Amino acid sequence: MSNAITMGIFWHLIGAASAACFYAPFKQVKQWSWETMWSVGGIVSWLILPWTISALLLPDFWAYYGQFNLSTLLPVFLFGAMWGIGNINYGLTMRYLGMSMGIGIAIGITLIVGTLMTPIINGNFDVLIHTEGGHMTLLGVFVALIGVGIVTRAGQLKERKMGIKAEEFNLKKGLLLAVMCGIFSAGMSFAMNAAKPMHEAAAALGVDPLYVALPSYVVIMGGGALVNLGFCFIRLAKVQNLSIKADFSLARPLIISNILLSALGGLMWYLQFFFYAWGHARIPAQYDYMSWMLHMSFYVLCGGLVGLVLKEWKNAGRRPVAVLSLGCVVIIIAANIVGLGMAS
């Protein structure tokens, strides 16, 4: 396996670790509605950071975006909005299925859809079917799904042992939302694929290869921001017991603390895709769609490890932890199989 591929896998791991940890600061926010907290974090992660980073990278910010016609920008924006819909459905999936089953089904579907639909759309699926490297990467995807399934099972055992249940368990509604979440969340993978002309234009301006994907985030995350912030603002305006005015009428130290914690959560959310761009840049072009598989499987891996570090599994017993450990090992094996496939 080449050093470039190894570093690509490593950066995807770092990005996934940030994704697994980003909600920790949000959990420390006090006396704010979820909608206000999510909006503040989202403004940082989807608007302020993408625009700021792009302004620092590009020699002429407005000229760069002005060179693209609507046929280039609109698919990138709409795929970003598609991801935004999946993001909202994610929370509802947890509500009706519980954390473990919801995450397992949603992540499994988005891993398959986001990874395999891209080469199909690009007309490159024959690379997977007719080459040795393609066979290896497909095997890696299959093994990753097994790993996700094992971690999901560990989570179910933990929830059963600790008496944790879904807020409003509804299998039919939860499965529908999980499928929708999985499909729509893959919009981020499709957006990265549609944004290739933007990446090439950034490279032509002399932007370092590690950073060429970052300017496209202004458009991708703009689409996601429209859906997420629109959802939050509508709820803040219409739901009777929600009030942004009340959230900002607390004691000043608490408001400042909540803003900083929400902003930190937003920063950590953004960093997952900052390092995703670094990893993506190191993956061979013919296998660039495997970035999504690496990111999502590592997200499950890191989520399990973070849970262990934070002692969320302390009272779960030995069997759930053993099953979790097995799932993490399988995901690591899957990443190595994919790496070997890309190198062959």
UniProtKB/Swiss-Prot annotation:
**Where found?**
Cell inner membrane
Can you tell me where the transmembrane regions are?
4-24, 38-58, 68-88, 101-121, 131-151, 175-195, 214-234, 259-279, 290-310, 321-341
Q: Which Pfam families match?
A: RhaT (PF06379)
Entry protein name: L-rhamnose-proton symporter
What exactly does this protein do?
A: Uptake of L-rhamnose across the cytoplasmic membrane with the concomitant transport of protons into the cell (symport system).
Q: Which GO terms describe its molecular function?
A: rhamnose transmembrane transporter activity; symporter activity
* One cellular component term from this protein's GO annotations in UniProt: plasma membrane
What keywords tag this UniProt record? Cell inner membrane, Cell membrane, Membrane, Sugar transport, Symport, Transmembrane, Transmembrane helix, Transport
Q: Which HAMAP family does the annotation name? A: RhaT (MF_01532)
Report the gene name.
rhaT
Tell me what organism the protein belongs to: Salmonella typhi
In terms of superkingdom, the source organism counts as Bacteria
The membrane-topology field of this record reads: Multi-pass membrane protein
**What reaction does this enzyme carry out catalytically?**
L-rhamnopyranose(in) + H(+)(in) = L-rhamnopyranose(out) + H(+)(out)
Please report which protein family the annotation says this sequence is part of.
Answer: Belongs to the L-rhamnose transporter (TC 2.A.7.6) family.
